[in-house]
Each structure stands twice: as C-alpha cells, then as structure tokens.
UniProtKB/Swiss-Prot annotation:
An example molecular function term from Gene Ontology annotations: mRNA binding
Mutagenesis or variant effect for A990V: In gun5; semi-dwarf plants with pale green leaves
Induction of its expression: By red, far-red and blue light. Down-regulated by white light.
Reactions performed catalytically: protoporphyrin IX + Mg(2+) + ATP + H2O = Mg-protoporphyrin IX + ADP + phosphate + 3 H(+)
Bilayer topology: Peripheral membrane protein
E.C. code: 6.6.1.1
Presequence positions on this chain: 1-49
Note: Plants silencing CHLH show significant ABA-insensitive phenotypes in seed germination, post-germination growth arrest by ABA and ABA-induced promotion of stomatal closure and inhibition of stomatal opening. In contrast, plants over-expressing ABAR display ABA-hypersensitive phenotypes.
Protein name in UniProt: Magnesium-chelatase subunit ChlH, chloroplastic
Pfam families in alphabetical order: CobN-Mg_chel, DUF3479
Amino acid sequence: MASLVYSPFTLSTSKAEHLSSLTNSTKHSFLRKKHRSTKPAKSFFKVKSAVSGNGLFTQTNPEVRRIVPIKRDNVPTVKIVYVVLEAQYQSSLSEAVQSLNKTSRFASYEVVGYLVEELRDKNTYNNFCEDLKDANIFIGSLIFVEELAIKVKDAVEKERDRMDAVLVFPSMPEVMRLNKLGSFSMSQLGQSKSPFFQLFKRKKQGSAGFADSMLKLVRTLPKVLKYLPSDKAQDARLYILSLQFWLGGSPDNLQNFVKMISGSYVPALKGVKIEYSDPVLFLDTGIWHPLAPTMYDDVKEYWNWYDTRRDTNDSLKRKDATVVGLVLQRSHIVTGDDSHYVAVIMELEARGAKVVPIFAGGLDFSGPVEKYFVDPVSKQPIVNSAVSLTGFALVGGPARQDHPRAIEALKKLDVPYLVAVPLVFQTTEEWLNSTLGLHPIQVALQVALPELDGAMEPIVFAGRDPRTGKSHALHKRVEQLCIRAIRWGELKRKTKAEKKLAITVFSFPPDKGNVGTAAYLNVFASIFSVLRDLKRDGYNVEGLPENAETLIEEIIHDKEAQFSSPNLNVAYKMGVREYQDLTPYANALEENWGKPPGNLNSDGENLLVYGKAYGNVFIGVQPTFGYEGDPMRLLFSKSASPHHGFAAYYSYVEKIFKADAVLHFGTHGSLEFMPGKQVGMSDACFPDSLIGNIPNVYYYAANNPSEATIAKRRSYANTISYLTPPAENAGLYKGLKQLSELISSYQSLKDTGRGPQIVSSIISTAKQCNLDKDVDLPDEGLELSPKDRDSVVGKVYSKIMEIESRLLPCGLHVIGEPPSAMEAVATLVNIAALDRPEDEISALPSILAECVGREIEDVYRGSDKGILSDVELLKEITDASRGAVSAFVEKTTNSKGQVVDVSDKLTSLLGFGINEPWVEYLSNTKFYRANRDKLRTVFGFLGECLKLVVMDNELGSLMQALEGKYVEPGPGGDPIRNPKVLPTGKNIHALDPQAIPTTAAMASAKIVVERLVERQKLENEGKYPETIALVLWGTDNIKTYGESLGQVLWMIGVRPIADTFGRVNRVEPVSLEELGRPRIDVVVNCSGVFRDLFINQMNLLDRAIKMVAELDEPVEQNFVRKHALEQAEALGIDIREAATRVFSNASGSYSANISLAVENSSWNDEKQLQDMYLSRKSFAFDSDAPGAGMAEKKQVFEMALSTAEVTFQNLDSSEISLTDVSHYFDSDPTNLVQSLRKDKKKPSSYIADTTTANAQVRTLSETVRLDARTKLLNPKWYEGMMSSGYEGVREIEKRLSNTVGWSATSGQVDNWVYEEANSTFIQDEEMLNRLMNTNPNSFRKMLQTFLEANGRGYWDTSAENIEKLKELYSQVEDKIEGIDR
C-alpha cells in the first residue's frame, strides 16, 4: 500500500533526496521555507477507515482542523470557525495560525475547521453548530451544494448578529448573504442597484463568470468603492482586501488576513494596533513550473527558460519531443500544497515529455488554455495532449458549468483532453479500501461533469494525507497517467504509415456464429469500411481482402494461417513463461483459474490469441468473460477475475503487436465490466491492468450512453457514437394485413346489411392471429347490435394499428453509411410526433388534430378504448403526418434515394404558400386548415434535424481520435426524444447525474404511475398495490432525464427539489391529500450501470424511502411504513434498516447472470435462476453510510420482495424492446416474487411503454406478444436482418433465445409464439436453407433453443416438429464439421 504513495517517507532514500532537492529548489519568494522531515511517519496508514464506520469522510486529525490557543495572561482568545471545500486552505490556514500563535502578543487564536462535505454527517454538523456558539469570526468558501449551503446558512444565521465578523467567499447566494463586516452587509444580496451588488446577480448566469467577476472586482477596487455609501466604504474595502488575501492563499497572506479582520472587528482587540502587510498578489493566470524562478505570463518567456535548463535529459532536448499541457489550480500552488503537481511534472519529464503547466485563479480555465496552449499566430496547438489535474470541469469548477464555452476552447486546441482526479473528499486509505472507488460526490463533480467537456481517463493520481489534509502523489497512478498522456500525445506526433492499430471485436456467447457481436451494427461490413478508409488515408493495411465476406472468413478460418485451429484463426501462440513475463498481474488470476495456460483460449500448452493482421492493423477477437459455461461460479467467487487467455490477449496487443491504439468495435465487450472499483480504479483493478498503456477508442451505439460511460471510466475509452438503424413502422403482414382489409370493408359496407357477416369474419381472423389474447372477442358477430359491432371492430382495429405503427429498427447499421431518404422520413415522423414546449414546437399530430376541433390526447384515449371513430381519426392523422414529412424529404432526395443538399433546399422551402411541400400535401386531406405558422415552426425544426440525421462523421471522428485530435463530445440517448444526439461520431457522454429527474420527467412519471396503479386496481378488485418491485436502468434514465427515477419517487409520494443550479439533492413528502392515494412501497433493483452512474440518486432514493417510513401516518395510508415496521419487528432491526429498498449488485459486479445461464443452457431448474438473482442482487445502498459501498442485506431484500403484488419495468425507446436484449429478463423477479410470497400468488407484471407520445401500460404478456408480432414473426424485420447476412441470422437467433429467457423468469410467453416462430423459420424450407447456409453456427443455436423450449415445458408442439428439429440439428452439426475440416 505504501508504494502507492509518492511522498518522502515512502520512497527510497535516493528518490526522497531527489524530491527533497527538487522541492528546495522550487521555493518562490512568496512561499516561506518549510522543513521536510525525512523521518518515517508513524502509523501513516493506521487512521481508522471511514468505510468501516459510517462511510462518510474521515476528518483530518485535530492538529490540522482544530488549533488550540496558547493560554497567556491578559491575552484575549479569538475563535475562528471556517467551512471550505478545498483541503489546501485548511492546511495553509492552520500553518498560518500556528505560526501566529507562537509570535502574537496581542491575541491567542483558536481555529476550528470543517470541509463542507463533512457536514453531511449528523454528529459533525452538531459539533459545527456548537463551535459557532462562541465563535468570533466565521469564514466560508466555495459552498455550492444546496443542501449543505442550507445547513451552513441555518447554523451561521443563528449566531450572525452576535459574531464580530462573517466572511463568505464565492458560494451560493443564500450563504453569501451572511457576509457582514461592521456596517457592510450582504443580507440584501442581489436586491440593490449598485454595481457591487449587481455583480452577485451574475451568479445565476454561471459560477465561473461569477468567480472571474470577483477577481475583476478585486483589480478594479477604486472604481467600485466610489459607488458605495461613505459609511460602508471602509468596511467594503476590508472585505475586498479579505478576498485578495484569501485568493492569495499562502500562509503569509492568510496570517495577515487573520490579523486584519480580528484587529478591525473583534471588540477585545479594539485599541490594539495590529500591524499587517498588504496582500501579496499573484498572476490570475500563468505558467508555473516547480524549478522555474518565477511564474510566467508569456509562453515565449517560459520556453526561453525551459530551453536553457541544465537539469534536463537528452529526450527533453529533442525538437520532436512530445509536449503535454497541464491545467492546475492556482490555490494549490499559492498554498504550497503542490507536491502532487510536482510529481506529475517530474514523471512526464523523466519519460521524455516536455511540460507546459498552466494555472488560473478563478473557475474558468478556457482562457488560459487558449492563451498558453495555442500558438497565437498559426492557431496550432503547442502541446500534443492536455491533462487537467484539477479534477473539475474546465469552466465552472464545482459550481455551475459552462460546457459550450469549454468545448469551444478545446475544439480550438484540438488535442486529446484528459482530466485526472485528485482525492478531495476521501483520504488515500478510504479510496484504497472502498469497493466504490471514488465517493459519490467526487464521481458527480470530478468525473461526470468533466465528461460533458469531452474529458477522458479519470485516473486517480493524488491522495490526501489524513494527518495534514495535504495532497500527495500516488506513484503508480502518476506513472499510469503520465504514460497514457504521452501515448495519446504520440498519436498527434507519429505518421499514419507507422501507427499500429488493434481492432478488437467481440464474440458473445462464444461461438463461431457470434464473432463480431455488437448492438445494431454490421461489424464486418463496418470494419471493412474503416480499413478501406484507413488505407486511403495513408495507413498500412497490407493484404486487405476485396470484400467484407472474405474478411469474415479470414478472421474465422484463414486457410493460410501459420497455426491450424478448430476454433478461430490463431494469430499468435504465447508460451506460459512469455505470458507471465508480459503480464505482471498473472498471479492474481490463479485463485480463480489455476496455473496458466488453463483451458480457455488455450491448446493446453500455449495461450492462443485469435485474429489476423493486415499490415499495421490487427483484427483480434476479444476472449469472452470466462463464466459463460458456468455462471453459478460467480455465486461463490468473491474475487472474480479475467482468465489467463483474456489477459494474454491484451498483453499481446500492447507488448508484442505494440499497438499505438486499440479500437473496440461496437457495443459491447467485457473489458469495461471486469472486476474492480466502480470509478477511480487502482492498479489492482482488472480493467486498468488489462488496458495497460494503450489509448483506447471505442465505437459505441449512440442510444447506449450508460454503458458507453462505463467504458469511458473503467477502460479509459474515447467513446465514438454510431447510429442505430433508423426506426420504421412495423407494418402488417399475413392475417394482420387481411384483418386491416376486412376492417376497411366494414367501414365502407357496415350500413348495407353486410356488416354482421364482415364482423364475424373479423372475429374469426382475429382469433387465427391470436388477438383474442389481447381483445375480448365474442364467438361471432351476427347477433351483435350495430353499437356492439362498432365496439368489437374498434378494439381489433386499435390493436392492429398498435402493431402497424410500432417502431422498429430494420437491418443493421454500417459505419460511414448515411441513411436513405425513407429512413430519414421514418425518423423525422417520429421526431415530429413529440411536443417540445421548451422550444415552443407543437407536435405535428397535435397540430393536425387541432384543425379538426380535437385535442390529440382525447384522440389517443378514444383510440385506446377502441372507439372506432377515434381509431380511424388517429389513422388519418398518422398517415397525414407521414405524407407531409415524405413530401418535405422528397424535395431533398436524389435519384439514388439519398438525402443531399439539405441546406440549399431548406432555404428555398421555408418560404410561404404553395412552395411549402407539406402545405401542398395537406391541402388534399381533411387537415387543409392546419395552422401554417405552427407547421412552419415544426418543419423548420425537422429541417435542422434532417441535416443532423444524414450527416456522417463516424469515420471522420475515428480518424481524428487516431491522429491525436479532440473528438467533440455529445449526449447519448434516443435521437427521437433528443435530436442533439445527432450527428453521430461524437465522444458520447451521459449527463449530470444530479440533474435528474427533471420537471418534465416528473410530469411524465406521474402519468405512468397513475395509469399503472389504476390498471392494477382494475384487475385486483379495486385494491391499491401495497408493493411494486421495479427496475432502474442507466440508459433509460439518461434518455428520459430520470422518468423511471421519478416514478419511484411518485409511488412513495415525494417530490424532488432542485437547487439554484438545477441539481436534485433533496426531496419533500407530498401530503396524502394531494397524493390522493396511499404511499406505495417499492423494491428497487438498480442495474449495475445505474449504480455506477447514478449513485447520488440512489442516495436520494434511499433517503426518500426512509423519510417516508418515518412519517407519522396511518399504516393503511403508508405501505412503506407498514412493511418497514413489520420487517423491523420480524428481523429485530431498527425501522431505517428495515426500510432498505434500494438494491443492486455488489460494487464492481453487473447483472444477475441469469442471461448467461439461459444463453448457455447451463441451468437445471427455475429455482436455480432465482437463487442466482437473490445472491447477485441483494446488495443494498445505505444513505446513512454513502461511502461504504454496497452491503449484502439478503434477509431484508427477500422480506421486501415477499410483499410485492406488482413487478414493473419501462421501455423508453423504439430501438430496444423486451426481446432485443437479455437485460430485461435478467432483471425480472416475477417468478421469484411468487416463490417468496406466503400465498404463492404470481404478481401482476406490467411494462410501461413511453416510446411514443401516447404512453401505455401493458401487461408483460401483452408486451411479449406485441414484440413477437412486430419483430420475430414480422417479415419486414427478419428480412431486414437477413439482408445483413451472417450477422443478421445471429440477431434472429438472439430474439428467440431472449424469448425463452422470459419463459424462464416470468412464464409469460404464449405457446403460439413458439409455434409461429417454428412455422416461420423451420417449416419454411427456403427460409431454413437460407439460415443454415448464411450462418450455420447461429442456426444450430436456434435449433437448440427450440428443443430447449420444448424440453423445459415452455412450448407444447407436435412430435413431428420435434423430430424435424433433431434431424436438422444433426445435419447442421455435420455441415459445421465439414466446414471445419
């Protein structure tokens, strides 16, 4: 452990002496000489870890945070209490006061300090309040978290009038208003018209601008003072001087600050003349190097000094040496808390990189970046990569950020941008011991927010000394950071011809039929497109085949390979000794996998690396996780690890192939999900060890920002988004199409006497299509009244329109291929279907409904009820929307069907009258009176969206990344909900985790919850559900800005409260009167990805649920309290622990692994799956110990689940539905809940579908049927997949396998689904042969899945069908073996 810490008492003597000499040589005139002891520190790592206590922050030792006054006769004591964000001020102020106490004859000072985050702890806050009771002076700085700002305000406000002085420097307005010095007060902050007070109104415009305005105020003091009343001028002057002292931050400045304030305002010192010096001012921005004689404001002067240094090695003298720019906080420099900065600079230079370390005194670093990193004449960067060591966003720091300004500066700089993390709210030991890694607050402020600027690589490089609160470098982490920064910089410097690239593809589950697994991506067609582009651009891609099909064959089985293999093509055989030499952590894998080589990716003697090289490009197949065949091992292995073959692959890529970069191709592999800390990894975490020093570029689906963020944080990836296939309407086929025609006939002929016969045909055909499972149908229609006939037809029509209009992605995307015109139409129609009040854009269907005197919501409701006239009107609105958008797009389409020249076309289209194609189209429909102004607004918006849809930057961004350039960041999510996701090719990020749920998300959440509750009441004799077990997904909450999170809050009856910055850190209970129903208990299963990204919101949820459990309300109106009291008594625990309801995996672990068992058929019975779920998902988050990680609470979990009457999940976008991925059934507890309930009653299972403007709540079985009809059994979908060949067959097989997963976890799949699938893919000889010949391995898995569904009792079919499946299985086995031979 000690080797991680880069400080004199843990280094070798020579290293310590070297650093000591460096330190002594870096003293500046503004820093007093400090003695550094070379004696070993006693019990350096024996401070009690917070992880074993309440999980909050370990407070620094008394000698730092509490200075006891020296008692002298007749010398008054002055007590100062302070609260600061940054620990460097704590140590600097302590040093200043300790020195003052030794020399002062006029006063003795008692100082008590708190870091702002410490005030979350109840006991610490109480101590703070007690300390304030006899304090003379209070100081606060950088208090920007609202809940803590309120706590500080409440405590200080009580003592403000009594205290002699209250000084608050840049913080939230409610804290700033506490300021008072004599007659100077800020209690009316923001209400005065004077320039001084108007300054603070800028707080709302952004904290970075606010802080920089304060600095400007300091520089322009004389001008400001003339606007102040004369009686306040002197006190205001002293406040400004205080700010100057504080920003100066050095012990000398802070000592003079204490002298000035105490001498001016403490009554006991009135009449005593206390001398103090003026503040020593430093550059607001500049360049600082620990060996330089001064700070520099000019880059040329800095280089003049740098190039004349005599202490540099030969590497630094090379003109082509890599140059790394560093961004530093001035406060660390001026307070002397800079040893971690020194360590990074020294490490970079020792490795041959030149360094330009810049700093800023405010919160906006964009100006210094442009000023010092970019040549003012050529506008070219003078650095090859940039690393921020602040740990904060480039503009705004820990307060309100200005990401557009940051992005603009970084685009001008155009180099890779890394943000490393110094531990601010944890000590080193806390971080090392924590399974979470970084504390939730640090993740939000120091990881999530910089990512919005385009930052990568959140490597923890500095810790905090628990004795002094000062920073120290973590040596191994500093090495990792510096090497990676240099490697990113080398991409800028190296020629294309010499760069080596390792493209990594995935195969999951492991099988030849699955090589090239990636969500919605035709992997090999895309790789071929990338390689062709690389070759044209000057990269060495020797031997590239002529097409993607040949490329697949060569990767799977190269006939001319050096090594023969029955599996994939072997690129390299690695002997055990070589593997151990190249893989320092190989021994750590032996606990789980034994001695190498093991039996995975091995021939028994060597470890095998699968793939093939084409010149300087290697295409390799990432080994699988290793537990696929035996997922039950994960139940018993507390220290899961990659296997030797997995480690060998990455050792080969880095140290034998010597890749300059690795490109992980598609969503997603296993690297980022390997065991280790959630965020802020150590060198003992497997993702960190595996990726080593290779720059990582990762193509990730634009609709999956949550897992992309995991890849960004845990595998240090520069994630580049790719488009998912644009959604199309499912359409109708076979009997469903016939039904549509019959309904059209009925509408035309119902009054001619043929109505009853047509209705009878509709009923008969609907039953043949199995719609009687969804619609209550009579036996026949002859005896029905006209009203009842309309009702039956309306309900059937509504159901088939639901199927027809269902959105689905057809086919697979190819990198670099823009959408066709028709694909653009489908996307734009769906974009137009949503209201966007924030942009004052009405939904197109709403505009059309309005012009015929209807509200679109009424039409939706009527259609849902099966009212025939409303179903027909909705169909007309839908058709008119498509037609109008098609007419618009056709004007921008060439003869090949591609969208071109959007900008020029739009200019001519957005005129008036007949030139507008949508007006022309609608003039021939019943909607000819639609509001033209509203139409013009929505089509103007669609025109902008169209430009984004057809823009292709996926290849361009990859080239930028490989050339060491900045890839512009952008949000991930659903492009229909949020068109800002487009164009793809962005460095994908999530969102500020503290910004959800938004107000709009809460409004949507309430609608869904009320519909869910009403539906359950309808089917449960009018009773409210007492408990709902539900799932929170990371991606869903990013796409919807927290809708499902909001659903949980509304179920229990609380509302989120946002602070000034829009951050949600508090909740308040909604009264039972307003709620109008009982508070419903919840059991929340958070996905591992949600846990990683939104642990602050898990904290919020847990606090909210426990708050509700403690409300003094009748238990029949508060089911949370009812169950918590029952469980507390049953388990002998307190009510807060019994109210634990927020669960997930253990830290660093993901999924229930039921999907692994199902995909590999490696389970015996459903109880085994249920045991896996309980073992993997019973880890609870505790808001009373937020830094302690996830703790196993299986008993509480089981008891909470046993009360559930409803299980519930959300679908939020058209791209991913229940059977598209295994995640949904992997997290479904339906059968488990049934087994835990005392009455053994199966809970109701519901799915909320918010993929369209008309949100629905369906049963699970209804949703599975809808999914089967629109995808698996739909020719439009499966033919679209077949057009992608090899990979398309795998997609079809995956849907069938996931359907079996739903049978296993819920029993909600109808027999006819399997029967129809068998008819579609097996009984059809032509289809059967296409599947077998295109991808025999995946077809074999499909046959196996059918047989398994029958064997497990999920599918009852004829003996003939089973016999045919067995015969086909034998045939395909022979075919595969023939291919292999």
